C-alpha cells in the first residue's frame, strides 16, 4: 500500500547516524520519517559504551554546536568523564565519556519522540523507490510504500551483514538483529560502487565474577566533572563509576596463537578489511609480536547492570579460545562471559561516489551516512548523519547543499577525506588528520559553527541565546584586556615579581602579560588587589565562567599562531573552493595525462581542492586544470552565492578565538 502522507525526508536506520539525521532534518522544518526495524533499539550503543576521545570528541562537540543530540545524551547518561591530553596543547585536548547504555538510549528516544515534524515507524526497509535518476521513497518488508523528496540511508553494519564466531557464521546486522539482505541486493542493482568491510566486538563479562582487588582502578575527572554539551550541566550526570585496568600476558598470547587455525580472519573466511586503529586481539598479537603485554580496560556498561566491556580484546576466535584468553588475565581468572565476542562483515559503498553533501552522484535525493560510507565509530556516524540530515532537508526544501570546509570543522575534514580519497579500511577520525587543528579545537566548536547552524535552521533559541551571551562576554573581556594597561608606576614591583618573576620595565597591556607562559587569566585579573579584573562578573554561572576564561586565555596566548594559520587558510583558499563544472570532460583538458584525466572523470571532484587531494593528481595537473577553467570562464567559487557559512570571514582569526 502507499502510505497516505508524503514526507520531505525519509531516514532509514535508527543508529547514531540515523537519529542525528532525522533530528536535524526535522529541526529545519522538513516533514521527516524515521524508519527502523526496531524502535526499542533507537540510539543503541552496539559496541563500546563510550563517546568521544582524540578527534572523536571534537566531532561530538561540533555536532552539539549544530544542535545535535549526542553530547546532550552523553551528559544525561555519562557515568565517567575524562579530559584526554589535558597536559598538552588545546588543539589535542579531547573529552571522553563512559555511558550507561540504557540511559543514553532513553535520552535519544525522548529527543526523537519530542521533536516536532518527526514521525517514527517500525519496519525494516527492503527496497527504495527510484524513478529515473532520483529516489522518491522507500518500501518496507511488508510492502508499505512511503514517498519522500529525499532519503537518507544509515544502515550501519546491517547491509548483508555476516557474523563470525570462530569458523561458525550466520547472517545478522549485529548480535540479535537481522541483516538487511534485500536492501543490500537492491543497492547492488543500482550499480553503486561497493565493497566489504569488517569490524568486531569483545566478549562481555559479568562484573560479579571479576576480582577487582587484583586490578588497577582508573577514576574519571571529578573536580570538576567535565560536560560534553555546550549546554550541559554537571548535575545532569548520573552516579560516576571507575573503570579498571588489567593486561594480557604471554600465556594469553599463546592461547590466542593456538586458536589462529580456527580464526575466520586467519583462515580466509573473512574477506572484509578491519579497522587499523581498533584491531582485534588476534591481530594485535600477530602485528605486534614483540610486545609481551597489552593494556585492557574493563568498562562498566551501566548503573543497573553487572556487565563489563573489556576494551582491547575484540575477537572472532572460537568461544572456547575466548573463554581461555579471558581467564588467563589477572583479575579475570573466574570471569563469566555473558556474550561472546564476534566479527561482522558488511557492505559499504565507495564514498568517492558521493558529493560533499553526502548525496550520491548517481541518484538524485539519495544520501548515505555512517558505516555505509566506510567509517567506523559512533562519533563519525553522528557527524555524517547530522550533515546528511541537513542536506536532505535542504534538498527537499529546494535549498543549496552545505558542507563545512576543512578549515571550518573536523566534519569538513571527515567528509573531504571520504569523498576525495575513499577508504581501503574503516575510517576513524584523529586530530592528526586536520591540518588546521589549532583552529579546530573542542573549546571553540560553538564559535566556529553555531552561527552557521542558526542560518541553517538547526540551532534553537535556547542554544542561540546561550551562545550569544558567551560570545559577547569573550569578545568584551578580550577587548578589555587588550586596552587595559599597567606601567612600572601603577604596578608595584613586588606584585609584578610575584606573578611574572621580575618587575615590569615599561607599559604592558593585560593581554600582553597574559600571553606570557605560565600566566593565567585569574593571575592577571588579580593584579593591584583585583583592580585589573572586570568591573562586573563575566557570568553568574561557574561552568560558563570557566568556558569564557578558557576561550579568552587560548585566544590571547595563541593569537600569533592562530593569525598565522588564518593567513595560511586565506592563501590556500584562493583556489580551494573553485567549483568544477558538472559536465566537464577531463580528456579535453590540454596537457593532462591519461591517468589523471581518467581519475578525474571517474571520481568527479566538485572543487579544485577536492581534485588536488585525489591520489595521483599532481600540482602540475591542477595548474593545467586552472588554465583550462580560466580560458573558458568556467570556474566559480563554491558557495559564493547563498550557502550558509560561505563567507571567508567565518574563519577569521577573531572567529577562531
UniProtKB/Swiss-Prot annotation:
Keywords: Cytoplasm, FAD, Flavoprotein, NAD, tRNA processing. One of its GO terms (biological process) is tRNA wobble uridine modification. NAD(+) binds at residues 274-288. Its main location: cytoplasm. One of its GO terms (molecular function) is flavin adenine dinucleotide binding. Its cofactor is FAD. Gene3D superfamilies: FAD/NAD(P)-binding domain (3.50.50.60), GidA associated domain, C-terminal subdomain (1.10.150.570), tRNA uridine 5-carboxymethylaminomethyl modification enzyme MnmG/GidA (1.10.10.1800). Pfam families: GIDA, GIDA_C_1st, SAM_GIDA_C. The keyword Flavoprotein applies. It is found in: Cytoplasm. The keyword NAD applies. Residues 635-657 are annotated as: Disordered. FAD binds at residues 13-18. One of its GO terms (cellular component) is cytosol. InterPro entries: FAD/NAD-bd_sf, GIDA_C_N, MnmG, MnmG-rel, MnmG-rel_CS, MnmG_C, MnmG_C_subdom, MnmG_C_subdom_sf. PANTHER family: GLUCOSE INHIBITED DIVISION PROTEIN A (PTHR11806), PROTEIN MTO1 HOMOLOG, MITOCHONDRIAL (PTHR11806:SF0). Belongs to the MnmG family. Homodimer. Heterotetramer of two MnmE and two MnmG subunits. NAD-binding protein involved in the addition of a carboxymethylaminomethyl (cmnm) group at the wobble position (U34) of certain tRNAs, forming tRNA-cmnm(5)s(2)U34. This is tRNA uridine 5-carboxymethylaminomethyl modification enzyme MnmG. It comes from Burkholderia thailandensis (strain ATCC 700388 / DSM 13276 / CCUG 48851 / CIP 106301 / E264). The lineage of its organism: Bacteria, Pseudomonadati, Pseudomonadota, Betaproteobacteria, Burkholderiales.
Amino acid at each position: 500500500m502507499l502510505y497516505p502522507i508524503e514526507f520531505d525526508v525519509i531516514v532509514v536506520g535508527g543508529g547514531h547516524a540515523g537519529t542525528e539525521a532525522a533530528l536535524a532534518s526535522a529541526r529545519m522544518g522538513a516533514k521527516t520519517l524515521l524508519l527502523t526495524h526496531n524502535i526499542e533499539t533507537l540510539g543503541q550503543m552496539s559496541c563500546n559504551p563510550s563517546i568521544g576521545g582524540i578527534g572523536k570528541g571534537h566531532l561530538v562537540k561540533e555536532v552539539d554546536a549544530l544542535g545535535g543530540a549526542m553530547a546532550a545524551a552523553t551528559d544525561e547518561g555519562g557515568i565517567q568523564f575524562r579530559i584526554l591530553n589535558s597536559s598538552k596543547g588545546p588543539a589535542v585536548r579531547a573529552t571522553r565519556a563512559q555511558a550507561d547504555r540504557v540511559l543514553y538510549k532513553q535520552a535519544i528516544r525522548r529527543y526523537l519522540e519530542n521533536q516536532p515534524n518527526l514521525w517514527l515507524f517500525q519496519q525494516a526497509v527492503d527496497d527504495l523507490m527510484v524513478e529515473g535518476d532520483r529516489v522518491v521513497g522507500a518500501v518496507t518488508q511488508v510492502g508499505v510504500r512511503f514517498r519522500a523528496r529525499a532519503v537518507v540511508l544509515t544502515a550501519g553494519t546491517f547491509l548483508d551483514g555476516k557474523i563470525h564466531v570462530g569458523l561458525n557464521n550466520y547472517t545478522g546486522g549485529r548480535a540479535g538483529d537481522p541483516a538487511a539482505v534485500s536492501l543490500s541486493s537492491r543497492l547492488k542493482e543500482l550499480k553503486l560502487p561497493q565493497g566489504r568491510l569488517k569490524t568486531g566486538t569483545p566478549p562481555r563479562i559479568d562484573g560479579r565474577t571479576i576480582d577487582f582487588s587484583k586490578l588497577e582502578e582508573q577514576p574519571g575527572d571529578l573536580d570538576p566533572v567535565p560536560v560534553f554539551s555546550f549546554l550541559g550541566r554537571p548535575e545532569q550526570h548520573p552516579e560516576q563509576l571507575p573503570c579498571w585496568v588489567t593486561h594480557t600476558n604471554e600465556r594469553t598470547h599463546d592461547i590466542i596463537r593456538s586458536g589462529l587455525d580456527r580464526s575466520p580472519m586467519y583462515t580466509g573466511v573473512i574477506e572484509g578489511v578491519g579497522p587499523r586503529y581498533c584491531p582485534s586481539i588476534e591481530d594485535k598479537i600477530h602485528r605486534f609480536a614483540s610486545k609481551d603485554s597489552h593494556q585492557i580496560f574493563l568498562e562498566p556498561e551501566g548503573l543497573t547492570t553487572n556487565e563489563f566491556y573489556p576494551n582491547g580484546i575484540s575477537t572472532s576466535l572460537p568461544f572456547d579460545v575466548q573463554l581461555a584468553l579471558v581467564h588467563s588475565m589477572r583479575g579475570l581468572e573466574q570471569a563469566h562471559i555473558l556474550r561472546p565476542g564476534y566479527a561482522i562483515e558488511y557492505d559499504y559503498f565507495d564514498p568517492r561516489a558521493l558529493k560533499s553533501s553526502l548525496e550520491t552522484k548517481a541518484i538524485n535525493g539519495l544520501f548515505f551516512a555512517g558505516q555505509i560510507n566506510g567509517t567506523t565509530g559512533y562519533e563519525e556516524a553522528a557527524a555524517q548523519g547530522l550533515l546528511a540530515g541537513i542536506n536532505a532537508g535542504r534538498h527537499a526544501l529546494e535549498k543549496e547543499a552545505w558542507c563545512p570546509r576543512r578549515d571550518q570543522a573536523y566534519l569538513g575534514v571527515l567528509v573531504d577525506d571520504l569523498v576525495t580519497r575513499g577508504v581501503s579500511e574503516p575510517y576513524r577520525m584523529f586530530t592528526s588528520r586536520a591540518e588546521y587543528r589549532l583552529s579546530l579545537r573542542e573549546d571553540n566548536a560553538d564559535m566556529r559553527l553555531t552561527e552557521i547552524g542558526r542560518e541553517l535552521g538547526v540551532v534553537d533559541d535556547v542554544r542561540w541565546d546561550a551562545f550569544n551571551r558567551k560570545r559577547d562576554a569573550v569578545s568584551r573581556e578580550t577587548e578589555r584586556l587588550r586596552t587595559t594597561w599597567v606601567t612600572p608606576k601603577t604596578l608595584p614591583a613586588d606584585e609584578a615579581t610575584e606573578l611574572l618573576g621580575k618587575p615590569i620595565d615599561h607599559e604592558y597591556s593585560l593581554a600582553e602579560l597574559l600571553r606570557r607562559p605560565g600566566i593565567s587569566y585569574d593571575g592577571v585579573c588579580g593584579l593591584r588587589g583585583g583592580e585589573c579584573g572586570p568591573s562586573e562578573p563575566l557570568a553568574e554561572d561557574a561552568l560558563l565562567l570557566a568556558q569564557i576564561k578558557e576561550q579568552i586565555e587560548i585566544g590571547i596566548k595563541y593569537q600569533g599562531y592562530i593569525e598565522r594559520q588564518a593567513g595560511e587558510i586565506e592563501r590556500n583558499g584562493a583556489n580551494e573552493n573553485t567549483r568544477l563544472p558538472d559536465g566537464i570532460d577531463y580528456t579535453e583538458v590540454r596537457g593532462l595525462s591519461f591517468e589523471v584525466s581518467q581519475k578525474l572523470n571517474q571520481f568527479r571532484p566538485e572543487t579544485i581542492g577536492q581534485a588536488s587531494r585525489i591520489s595521483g593528481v599532481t600540482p602540475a595537473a591542477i595548474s593545467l586544470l586552472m588554465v583550462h577553467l580560466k580560458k573558458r570562464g568556467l570556474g566559480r567559487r563554491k558557495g559564493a552565492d547563498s550557502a550558509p557559512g560561505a563567507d571567508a570571514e567565518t574563519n577569521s582569526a577573531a572567529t577562531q578565538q
